[in-house]
Structure formats: structure tokens, C-alpha cells
A protein has these predicted regions:
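Surface-exposed extracellular loop regions of Gram-negative outer-membrane beta-barrel proteins
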Residues: 40, 91-93, 146, 160, ...
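Face-selective signature of the C-terminal outer-membrane beta-barrel domain
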Residues: 6-147, 161-164, 220-223, 277, ...
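C-terminal beta-signal and adjacent terminal beta-strands/loops
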Residues: 284, 332-352, 367-371, 378-445
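Transmembrane beta-strands of outer-membrane beta-barrel pores
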Residues: 34-40, 76, 87-93, 135-141, ...
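Structural signature of Gram-negative outer-membrane beta-barrels, strongest in the C-terminal barrel
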Residues: 78, 107-232, 280, 287-289, ...
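Gram-negative outer-membrane beta-barrel transporters
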Residues: 123-129, 228-230, 254-341
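Residues that define the transmembrane beta-barrel architecture of outer-membrane proteins
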Residues: 9-13, 62-66, 108-114, 148-152, ...
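Outer membrane beta-barrel strand-and-loop segments of large Gram-negative receptors
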Residues: 56-71, 107-117, 197, 201, ...
């Protein structure tokens, strides 16, 4: 309802430039990049959204990042080497007020983030084996949970041509990846000014992927892969006792709470893909994934993640007609996904802030998601530019988007609250199944 919706205001600025220079011997290239970006995000929830008075929750955050990246590509005999480093100056400030938990603090942190990586590539066995090995390391000057060596990420991959005609391949890749805690987590403080998440660790994920690829022609290929992703040091909420992988599905501030880095997770499944490059006026990509996704609570129990839909299907493709006409379509399907139901009693106390009942995670699911879009393009090629006019219809199959049940305070026909206060399920007019037409143009110089 309107009284539950947060008021969100955002502003972003991004700028950057890069400089590339070949080495004098001609065996490589050095790329230097400089970029900066700013993000201002004001997130507020009021008891009265119309007048925007009586604040319940407020989170005003500002981020400023300045990055320098260096990348060197060199060729030595049969080897291709890639070496790089990055430096980032980060400034983050946050003003938070949470009436429900009696929290009110201001924070400002400024720190450096740095990393380095290296990779070597070459072919063996008469060009039948493509081999790559490398690593990456990351750290920062603020968080104390892990160091540069703790975040060492080795990676290995190869592709072996099972037949000399290069049509049938076996692919395998193994890698470790680290992700820094978010600014919201690192900047979280209690009322005494203590940074409660400063010792949070980088989230670790180990990826194992293997499969086969068959190139039936120069313009089409079929792949089937099995994957297993294992997560550790994953942030877990100490308030709700649930992994942050199962929070933040809506418009919320994620990580603005005390967390533990003891969470674990795993995602595994099979994916098959068919890709057709432009051939006989047709192009397209079709993919199907069957998977499981689980993350642990504070007690170590594995629970389904909120994106554990079991089935994912996607298609995008098109057909080029005569006289520069083109028709294209996109289709997405997702199986039933778990969601967290509302805790009625707790929400009645905290209203308009909605409290979810994470104890019931995995017991209820949303219906399947199914949506298709269609687009028509007409292109004119002129001497110095091209003009593309398009007409698009989103959700042209008129499918509804599944939503969990919503609750609001019980009111009479005049809109006045009924005493004693109670929550009732809201009846909503389903407009998610409405097709959305749009028209636009693109000019290329």
C-alpha cells in the first residue's frame, strides 16, 4: 500500500577515460584507466507518506569512488600473459535512523581498496588444448576480517578439442572468487559509535564448471554444463538469524544491521544452451537451467534461497526481413520461488514497517513467472549516420507477475482506522498483466 512504500531518491554521476599504448617491440599493449563515480541514495519510510512526516526509518547514504586500473598484455613465444592491478579510493557516508530498534547514528569512512591479478594462456597438443591459469588478490585498508593473502583467488580452465575438426569440445573451469562486504555493512554502527561489522570477512565462492560443446556449424553451437558453486564466509543477519541471500528481495536497505561471516551456501545444477548466430536471416539463444540453491541460517541449517526456482528458461532471437525490417522477441520463465511471509503480530507493532517471518522460509512459494516481449525495427542507412525506429510491446502474452500477499491496517469504507487495530490482507488490482507498448529511435553517427 502507499503507506508502506518507501520514498527513494537517487542521483548518480559517472566519468572515465582510458589510454592504450603498444609496447615498442610490438608484443603487447598497456591500458591505463581512470574513472570516478558518485551515488547519492535517500531511503525513507514515514508513517504518513503523503505529508512525509513522522519518520519510521531513514537511511541517507553517499558513495564516491575513484579508480585507477593498469593492465598489461604481453606475448612471449606461445604464451599470452595478462598482468594488472587496481587502486580505488572510497568515501562512504551514512545517516541512519531506525525507530523500531532505537538506532540513530552518522558514519563516514574513507579507505583504499587494492588488488592485483595475473593470467597466462597458451595452447598445447597441436592446438587441441587451450589452457589458462591465473590468480587474483584483493584487500582494503578498512575492514579487518581478512588480508590480501587471505583473499588469494586461484583460477584454472581448459578446453580440449575431442575431434580434430574442432566441433566437439570438453570444457572445464575451476576458480575461487572473493567479494568485499558492502559499504552498508562496513559503515554500520551502534549508538555508541562502534563499527560492529568492521571484522567482516570477504565472501568466498568456489566455482566448479564442466561440460561439452558441440559446434554443428560455423554459426551454431550446443552446450551442456554441470556447475557447483560453494559459498563460505557469507554474511548472516544476527537480528533475523538468516542469510542475507534470503533478504533484500524488495525495496530495502540490505546489510544495515549486525552480521556474522559464518554463513555458507551452495548452488548446483545443469544448464543447456543453443546459440544460433545470424544465418539465413535468423539468430537466437535458448537456455534452460535446472538448479538448487541453499544458504545456511545462524544455526547452520541449509534453507532454500529466495531465487531457488528450480527451473529457468530464456529465449531471445529475431528474424531479419527485407528492406531493413526486423522482428525480435524475448521470453523468460522461472519456476516457483520461495518467499518469506509476513509476521502479522510483529508487523502490527512496527507498522508501517513490514516484519517478515523467516522461520517459515521455504514453506510457501510464489507462482511461476512467465513473460514475453516482442519488438519491430525499421532501419535506414544514410551516408554519415543510420536511423533506427522501433516499436516494442512488453508482456504481449498478458501474463501476471506473481506477488506475495500484502497486508494493511483494517479500515472502514470511509478510510478511517477500525479500533482495535488489526491487519487484513489487501485486495489489489492486478495491473502486472497489462501489456506495455513503447516506441523509440536510435541514431548512430
Amino acid at each position: 500500500s502507499i503507506e508502506q512504500a518507501p520514498i527513494i531518491k537517487q542521483r548518480t554521476i559517472t566519468a572515465g577515460l582510458s589510454w592504450k599504448k603498444k609496447y615498442k617491440d610490438g608484443n603487447g599493449l598497456m591500458t591505463t584507466s581512470l574513472s570516478t563515480n558518485r551515488l547519492g541514495n535517500i531511503f525513507s519510510r514515514f508513517r504518513d507518506n503523503i505529508s512525509q512526516s513522522n519518520v519510521v526509518f531513514e537511511n541517507d547514504s553517499y558513495e564516491w569512488e575513484t579508480k585507477i586500473r593498469l593492465k598489461s598484455v604481453r606475448y612471449f613465444d606461445d604464451w599470452k600473459t595478462v598482468i594488472g592491478t587496481n587502486f580505488q579510493n572510497s568515501t562512504y557516508s551514512n545517516n541512519t535512523k531506525n525507530v523500531l530498534y532505537g538506532l540513530n547514528y552518522n558514519t563516514k569512512i574513507k579507505f583504499l581498496k587494492f588488488g592485483l591479478y595475473a593470467r597466462g594462456e597458451r595452447t598445447f597438443l597441436n592446438d587441441r588444448l587451450d589452457f589458462s591459469i591465473g590468480f587474483r588478490m584483493d584487500s582494503d585498508s578498512f575492514s579487518e576480517g581478512s588480508s590480501l593473502t587471505d583473499n588469494f583467488s586461484p583460477r584454472l580452465s581448459f578446453s580440449y578439442k575431442l575431434k580434430p575438426d574442432n566441433r566437439f569440445k570438453w570444457n572445464l573451469s575451476i576458480g575461487r572468487y572473493y567479494k568485499m562486504p558492502t559499504y552498508t555493512m562496513l559503515g554500520y554502527k551502534d549508538n555508541n559509535g562502534n563499527y560492529l561489522n568492521k571484522e567482516s570477512k570477504y565472501t568466498r565462492s568456489d566455482h566448479y564448471v564442466t561440460g561439452f560443446e558441440y559446434n554443428s556449424s560455423n554459426s551454431s553451437r550446443i552446450t551442456i554444463e554441470g556447475f557447483y558453486k560453494r559459498y563460505s564466509q557469507y554474511p548472516v543477519s544476527l537480528i533475523d538469524n538468516v542469510s542475507l541471500a534470503n533478504k533484500g528481495g524488495g525495496f530495502e536497505v540490505l546489510g544495515n544491521e549486525p552480521i556474522s561471516s559464518d554463513g555458507k551456501g551452495k548452488t548446483y545444477g545443469i544448464e543447456t544452451l543453443y546459440q544460433q548466430k545470424l544465418n539465413k536471416n535468423f539468430y537466437g539463444v535458448f537456455a534452460y537451467t535446472f538448479f538448487y540453491s541453499r544458504f545456511t541460517s545462524i544455526e547452520g541449517e541449509y534453507l532454500p534461497s529466495v531465487w531457488d526456482s528450480r527451473h529457468l528458461i530464456s529465449f531471445s532471437g529475431g528474424y531479419k526481413l527485407k528492406k531493413n525490417w526486423e522482428i525480435s522477441a524475448r521470453w523468460r520463465f522461472s519456476g516457483k520461488t520461495p518467499f518469506v511471509p509476513v509476521n502479522i503480530n510483529a508487523t502490527l507493532v512496527s507498522y508501517p514497517e513490514i516484519i517478515l517471518d523467516y522461520q517459515k522460509l521455504g514453506t510457501v512459494k510464489l507462482n511461476t513467472f512467465n513473460q514475453a516481449d516482442i519488438r519491430f525495427d525499421k532501419k535506414w542507412n544514410l551516408k554519415k549516420l543510420s536511423f533506427n525506429l522501433y516499436f516494442q510491446i512488453e508482456n504481449f502474452l498478458v501474463q501476471s507477475i506473481p506477488f506475495p500477499k500484502e497486508y494493511g491496517l483494517n479500515r472502514d469504507q470511509s478510510g478511517f482506522l477500525i479500533q482495535p487495530l488489526s491487519l487484513v490482507e489487501l485486495s489489489r488490482e492486478d495491473r502486472s498483466n497489462t501489456p506495455i507498448p513503447s516506441i523509440g529511435f536510435v541514431i548512430d553517427f
